[in-house]
Amino acid sequence: MSPRPRLAVIPALLLVAVTAIWGWTFVVVKDAVVAFPVAAFLAYRFALAVALWTPFLRHLRWRSVLAGSWIGVFMGLAFIVQTVGLHVTLASDTGLITGLFVVLVPAIEWVVFRVRVPRATLIGVGLALLGLLLLVGALPRQLALGDLLVALSAFGFAVQIILVARFSRHHDPVSLTVGQTVSALAIFILAAATPMGGGFPVPSASVLVAIAITASLATALGLFVQVWAQRQLAATTSAIVLLTEPAWAMFFGVWLSGNPFPPIRIAGAALLFATPVFVTLAALRARRPKPAKAEEPEDADFAVAAS
């Protein structure tokens, strides 16, 4: 087997690790920011993440920064629209509808770029959606404005995943990460400055800790690893891995907070965890070179005549 398929496991594992960090930070900071304006928290978080990248400013490639800024626009708008939708719909509906990005990624890639998704990956998409449904525990009862807003945010996250997969192969990962962080920061600042945004209150000590954790691990490190990993992963495969975030949040919620969860939700989380493994193994098997056919021995009479 060639070394390339084996190396593809490393980006997948790193993306899993980042997704686990995102799930962990959700559990760690949710109580600290429950009464803090979301737009302001995101603005402070991304501002600190940008500050953490300042030692690398002299080495940035500005063409890659510009490309990353387009990614950040979709990511920033997706965050804001999701936040607005969350205020007018159920949290369970938000989690399920946001997870639709795992379907939107292959759909958009096929419609726009004519990218065909392998059958095993499509099966993985179905398994991931089933796992998410079991984890959330219910289908939306009826579509409302909030549900449509959350669906729009899922579209934004899907576009972000696709653009990262496409741009990361041709651009410097640090510059691409900085670009999307800065443009998302601009959107969060504008959102916080609106009458409904809540302004920029002074963070408490617990909120400052939450900002520091999410800025360093979930944003600066997390977005960089996502960009680097997606250079070698298909966009749909990446989406399946990223969909495990709510399962990681549940896992850390049980471990750190002792939150009780019914068996059906645990089964959903287990299915979400298993799906990326299934898709990755299927991809490795598809890339495995087929054994060469044994050469036919030369005819003895022909060999003698040719000598």
PLM regions with names:
Residues W53, M75, V117-G137, S153-F157, ...:
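Hydrophobic transmembrane alpha-helices of multi-pass small-molecule transport proteins
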